[in-house]
Every structure is written in structure tokens, then in C-alpha cells.
Amino acid sequence: MVWNNECQDAWLGWGWKCEIERQNKEYADKIWAQYRQQYHVTLPGVVREYAPGTFYWPSSPFAFEGEMSGTTDGDRHYWSVWHGKAPISDYDSEKSRFFSEYGFQSFPEFESVKRYAPYPEDWDIRSEVMMSHQRGGDHANGLIETYLLNEYKKPRDFRAFLYMNHVLQGDAIKTAIESHRRQMPYNMGTLFWQHNDCWPVASWASRDYYGRWKAQHYYVRKAYDDILISSVVEGDDLKVYAVSDRLENTSGQLQLQVCQFDGTVVHHWGKSVGISGNDSRVCFSAPLAKLLEGADRGTVYVRVDYTDKSGRVYHNNYCLGKQKDMDYPKV
């Protein structure tokens, strides 16, 4: 794969075009003409000649030639969460036809970190050795700390920090993928950045250099399952979406429980539900206040289980607030 990464958006929207036009309009026109020749004439011609029938996309993100990418056509790179410091919850409101890049950083797990930082005196995210293995420098460390303390309570030590950073990353990308899939058919694709690493480093990867799965990798495996049962609060209502990437229709039993953390069931609902192939639709909606039956949002979570006609169970949990605001029992 030859990947033209963000070149058109960079030229049009990152100030490059304006700056070079200000210096030399003729030179700027030449750059754009060469760009058009390479990505809209030469390369698609090569693909047609040597791989007829192969899909060609001139840039990513891209919607129309000579225009910035947007939310109504083509694909979109979304980095307001992470680089832009927007809250993770913003994933639930962002739209696109195809989210082709977004991500959230984490460190490798403790056992992997010990491979390149074996001494306890280096077990600090700003130690010299840890900084040498941070893809985004201290700016990225600051973002991790900011997001972590916004969503979770302060970790007790370095090892706990690494673990909670993994869960934070997994929560963020799970939130994004579920939102994108609920938007079907308006949105028909979601690709997170990134899968793995070429060296041991803090990065956006879901598997570290040594092949160890981060929490994110487990989360996305489930979030990308052929059927997704996803709960979300919209306005005053709790809604449960059934999303299917299967081509055929299916049916099964949907169970919803609002549970306290000691296992007490506050509210229960169950029904036989049909799910259309290649579709997303709301299969349950009710006022959240009614479901809570007087319970505080921080003392409960929503559990949904869908059992299809073959007996396979799809399960998902949903918290009604930030993790630091949940009243978890001490263990």
C-alpha cells in the first residue's frame, strides 16, 4: 500500500499553501500541479494498468479534489480527543462517513517497561530512559496525565499508573468505536491508530513491541465483533443499540440490568429482539431516571446481554459517569 497521508488537507488547511503563495505564487501553483499529476493522474493510471479493479483513494483524509475533508463525504482523521485535549465523551457526538484515523496513547505494560528500564530509579515517566522511549515526548506524558486524572483517581505508584493508563486507553477507543458503529449507515468504517510498534515505546499502539496485548487490544477485539450491543445516554434517556455487520438477519434474547456493584439488580428488562443484517438501530429506550429507581448514577452500572439463536452471547457494560466518580467497593 502506498499511503498519501494527509497531504491534501495539510496543503489546504495547515497554512502551507497560504505561506508559499505569499512568498511565490508561481512556485505554489507548480507544487499543486505536481501533486495533482502524481496522485490524480500517474498513480491511478499505474493501478489501472497493473492491478485493474483495485480501489484507489488519492489521499487520506479525502473527500473531493482541492477541498478539505469534512464530516459529510469521504474519510476523516479525528484528533480533537488526544491532541486537541477534548474530553473522551466527545467521541459520542462526532460524525463522519468513515473515521480512518484517531487514537490515544499509553505506555507498554510494566513487564515490557522493565525490559528497557530494569532499575527502580528509572520507574518514573519523566526519567531519562522513559523519556527516550516516549514517542510524543513530554507533551504526550502531559496529555496522558491530564486525561487520566480527568477520568480516574490518582494512581498510587508507577506500576499502577501504567495499568490505569492501559484501561484509560482502552476505554477511550472503545467509546470511539462503539459511537462510530452506532452511526451506521451514516458512518461505515472506523480504523484506530495504531496496531503495533516497531520499537519499545509509549505510543498509540494496542500491542507493544514485545507482542503483549494492551487493554485496548482486548477492548477493540470485542468492540469490532460482528454484533455489538451498545448502551449510551442520549438526553434524558438510556438507549441500547443493536449493530450488526452480518449480512443476514438474526434474532435472540436481549437482557438489560441496572446493577449495583454488590450485584443487587435495581432494574431488569428482557425481550426477544430481531436484528437486521448490516444495520444499526435502537432496540431499547427508556428514561434513565425510571431505570435508576432512585439509585445514584455513581452506584450502578448498566449490563446488557444479547444471546443469538445459536446460543452465542454478546455482553457489554456501561457506566453512567466517569470512573473516578463511581462508588466502587473496596477490595
Language-model features and meaning:
Residues 1-2, 191-193, 304:
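Extended hydrophobic secondary-structure segments that form protein cores and membrane-embedded regions
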Residues 163-165, 207-208, 272-278, 291:
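Short, contiguous acidic/charged loop-to-helix segments that flank catalytic cores in large enzymes
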Residues 5-6, 33, 58, 101:
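Residue-level detector of functionally special positions within alpha-helical transmembrane segments
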Residues 310-331:
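Short beta-strand elements
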Residues 13, 27, 38, 42-51, ...:
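Substrate-binding clefts and catalytic carboxylate motifs of secreted carbohydrate-active enzymes
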Residues 18-19, 114, 257:
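Residues in and immediately flanking transmembrane alpha helices
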Residues 1-32:
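Active-site groove signature of glycoside hydrolases
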Residues 237-286, 296-307:
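Beta-strand-rich binding/interaction modules
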